[in-house]
Amino acid sequence: MKLGRRKFLGLGSAALVGLSLKREKKIEGSFVNDSFQMGHLLRDRASFPEAKRKEKLPVVIVGGGIAGLSAAWRLHKRGFHDFVLLEMNSQPGGNARWGENEITAYPWAAHYVPVPGPKAVYVRELFEDLGVLRDGQWNERYLAFAPQERLFLYGRWQDGIEPAVGLKQKDREQFQRLEERFAAYRNSGSFTIPLELGLSAKDQALDGLSFSEWLHQQGFDSRLLHWYMNYACRDDYGALASDTSAWAGIHYFSSREVEEKGPLTWPEGNGWITRRLLERVSENIRTNQMVHRITESARGVSVFAGDTEFQAEFVIFAAPTFLAPYLLEKFPGLHDFVYSPWLTANLTLDRYPDSRGAEPSWDTVFLDSPTLGYVDAMHQSLRTFVDRTVWTFYWSLAEGAPAQNRQLLLEKDWAYWKEAILHDLERVHSDIRQCVSRIDIMRMGHAMIRPAVGSMFSEERHRLSRLDGRILFANSDLSGISIFEEAQYHGVEAAQKVFKKLHG
């Protein structure tokens, strides 16, 4: 039985459980890292207790994702240690958090970084500091091992995610022609990482179209080509191609150097980077610190978290920008910041399931699935024999309004999502239920900013990124896309501005 997304998500938990009750062994699990209750306190303008104590220091960083950690890393490298980073959750990292069990460490969200090009100066500097890049050479241990990617389509496997099986001559010609278009945009110098180094008004018209509209206008109508473009948008932006700015869609394929090596990955995904950053700045980090108010005066900035008022000269606001109107006094509402909800899950496997004769791959995708597939945390293992593993399963809820999908995440229980995940995997791995012993699920209502049509040249975002007062914004959403390089760039830039203000 093949179910479309709407019909599938319309099934109740009982109906899904009934699909396999007779043959399923008991699978443990739960929702993990849920922090939406705290976020909803801010949304609902809840009252918080008055501060009982004060702490004075030059710099406060709000938010412990990659942007905040990168700001801390840069300050630390400059020899400046008189700052504190406040993180709402018990574990820093944001979209680069990780988990660990008796088998392996594993990612909770971002799981790789493409090999950065020469313009990504800060990322390359970081990777030199972490030992990933030495004397211009990438450490082979951190490059994804082969086989890297596989796609299941038409009852068989193929290497790579771009469809190559079942293509007609028209499909091949369109894939080739589109790659030539992307190469031309790449050579134009307007599509760069970091994004703002190349952003040019001459390409602004592309922002007024959706990516799917642009593809059709250019004469691309291959079903498999549109599936692949749509998959890319769901994977990187949490949005359908029809909801993605054409500029952003082109940027995905035209912004990176043509590089055979890569991507860079670790068992815990980008959590490995988080861990290495924490080794350097852990003394400055305060976890379980929910910031609930920020006020600014001529004397400085006060950040209220828990029972403490942190009095600072400067604040680096590295938390998602959509929180600013709920935290900062007289901060205007935001219109160009739309966020995509995601669900991720980590499945503990006591053995590998049947894969129809295929060798395990790092990244696995199914054609026409509403989900994004899974990555194998043990793929980078140097062990000669691997029997147990953890699969990290990704699902960007891209179809429909983000607010409705956030509500769906909250309304459905763990059993419902467990069945949804297993049902998707069963299309290829028929014995998956006999292999899985645990499924832990993380719900992220505002996982990443969505590069909606008309948003990439947003004056609202550019204005916030140019602010040069006591409060500096630093989240990746200032770029309109949520990728590691942009988060790190904004974090480092904000730290450098603050350091210059303090030291001249």
Residue map of PLM features:
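Beta1/beta-strand and adjacent pyrophosphate-binding region of the FAD-binding site
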Residues: 54-65
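N-terminal Rossmann-fold NAD(P) dinucleotide-binding loop
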Residues: 68
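Dinucleotide-binding Rossmann-like beta1-alpha1 core, especially the glycine-rich loop
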Residues: 102-184
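Active-site/ligand-binding neighborhood in enzyme catalytic cores
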Residues: 190-293, 298
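Conserved flavin/dinucleotide-binding core of flavoenzymes
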Residues: 20-48, 154, 160-163, 354-504
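Mid-domain catalytic core of redox enzymes
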Residues: 287-392, 428
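N-terminal secretory signal peptides and thylakoid transit peptides that target proteins
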Residues: 1-15
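Glycine-rich FAD pyrophosphate-binding loop
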Residues: 76-99
